Amino acid sequence: MASTAAPPAALVARRAASASVAAPLRGAGLAAGCQPARSLAFAAGADPRLAVHVASRCRAASAARGTRAVATMAKKSVGDLTAADLEGKRVLVRADLNVPLDDNQNITDDTRIRAAIPTIKYLLSNGAKVILTSHLGRPKGVTPKFSLAPLVPRLSELLGIEVKKAEDVIGPEVEKLVADLANGAVLLLENVRFYKEEEKNDPEFAKKLASLADLFVNDAFGTAHRAHASTEGVTKFLKPSVAGFLLQKELDYLDGAVSNPKRPFAAIVGGSKVSSKIGVIESLLEKCDILLLGGGMIFTFYKAQGLSVGSSLVEEDKLELATSLLAKAKAKGVSLLLPSDVIIADKFAPDANSQTVPASAIPDGWMGLDIGPDSVKTFNDALDTTQTIIWNGPMGVFEFDKFAVGTESIAKKLAELSKKGVTTIIGGGDSVAAVEKVGVADVMSHISTGGGASLELLEGKELPGVVALDEGVMTRSVTV
């Protein structure tokens, strides 16, 4: 069977079909609500080296966990502001309007523009004057092809008003346009990255930008992990500085729901390299009950356990790390599932020959590019036991249709579970492209708009653009 290659693919754990595996699990202190033995263990026939570091039980739902209070510091949101706070006020809104354009400057995907609309409409409905700022691409100075001009028609259409555009970001001409702005009107500034001072977080530039407004709303989650002038710098000069609806939703799901999830809580982590997901895996091991690993990173885990991986992608300098992560999962009682079968290819190409083999039987000269059907079944069985799922990273080289089955199967499973009330969070990046490709994006509980910002938040890092905002009300929730 011909197949295509891409970064080595994900692997999934084999279904527990044997009483010899299941029996010990029943006495492992599993909590009510976990349905572990049948789906969370390796089959007795699986290579023992695949199972050696895997804890096949749901974590901490036993009496050992008990009741836990979780405190989170919320940020003040635009929804906390009333008409009395907003009417007649100049509001600087940092949005993420970094949309793709074709060679004719036509927008090819307006998702980020649509995501910014609720915050803008709320401000307009409360009589504010909105000054909208964003970046587009990575310009080196003023670069016409990175102008925000092509965004004006779509913004105007979605808002139902004529959006005006400035030819600059700061300066006398911009100040005049702001002064002439009526209540309920929108002015779009030019690409803020036309100024090198933006990414340097230059205080003087931030001060000039802030001087245009009375208060600040950050709704650009995709750049919240950067301390730039328009995300962090302006907060030193504008109060209040609050989160927009999109940014708040990202925090609610990627921080709130992940830190204090409905359990059992499963995390699916894919991607080509362990090195790019170390922080995410380590952070999620502190929080999740089940961790499913896929993508090319899996082969580093396999080689660390002494398995032959053929020509699959391996990070030789991360073998010890892979072993330690497996040991950490076992120590914390996290059910870490590895694929039991893999779809392999004889080259990294769409027209490659392919076949399905056990994860322990990858021949020389072949590379893994997707998880196999047994692995998909095992992953799906595990996900059936959960109440919260977060997914970051594809299961295989889904850019090639032949190796997209594993990734698309996971997307469809999450859509099915989301309809049943399971909280499903798509943590940015290629996972978003996957659910959009399958046509199930609208069904998910939350789809993150951030790439690097999503990863850093999942890693437990503080995001400068969020830290700089005004603090909201301390919330406290309890899980049992």
From Swiss-Prot:
Catalytic activity: (2R)-3-phosphoglycerate + ATP = (2R)-3-phospho-glyceroyl phosphate + ADP
Keyword set, alphabetical order: ATP-binding, Calvin cycle, Chloroplast, Kinase, Magnesium, Metal-binding, Nucleotide-binding, Plastid, Transferase, Transit peptide
Transit peptide: 1-72
InterPro entries, per the entry: Phosphoglycerate_kinase (IPR001576), Phosphoglycerate_kinase_CS (IPR015911), Phosphoglycerate_kinase_N (IPR015824), Phosphoglycerate_kinase_sf (IPR036043)
GO cellular component: chloroplast; cytosol
Residues noted as binding ATP in the record, renumbered to the chain: 277, 296, 368, 399, 430-431
Binding sites annotated in the UniProt record for Mg(2+): 430
UniProt binding sites for ADP: 271, 295, 398
A Pfam family reported for this protein in Swiss-Prot or TrEMBL: PGK
Broad enzyme group: transferase
GO biological process, one term: reductive pentose-phosphate cycle
Domain of life: Eukaryota
GO molecular function terms listed in the Swiss-Prot or TrEMBL record: ADP binding; ATP binding; metal ion binding; phosphoglycerate kinase activity
Binding site for CDP: 271, 295, 393, 398
Cofactor: Mg(2+)
Binding site for AMP: 273, 277, 296, 368, 399
Pathway: Carbohydrate biosynthesis; Calvin cycle
Subcellular location: Plastid, Chloroplast
Binding site for (2R)-3-phosphoglycerate: 95-96, 98, 112, 134-135, 137-138, 193, 225-226
E.C. numbers: 2.7.2.3
HAMAP family the UniProt entry points to: Phosphoglyc_kinase
Summary of subunit composition and partner proteins: Monomer.
Protein family per UniProt: Belongs to the phosphoglycerate kinase family.
Family matches, as PANTHER family: PHOSPHOGLYCERATE KINASE (PTHR11406), PHOSPHOGLYCERATE KINASE 1, CHLOROPLASTIC-RELATED (PTHR11406:SF23)
Protein name: Phosphoglycerate kinase, chloroplastic
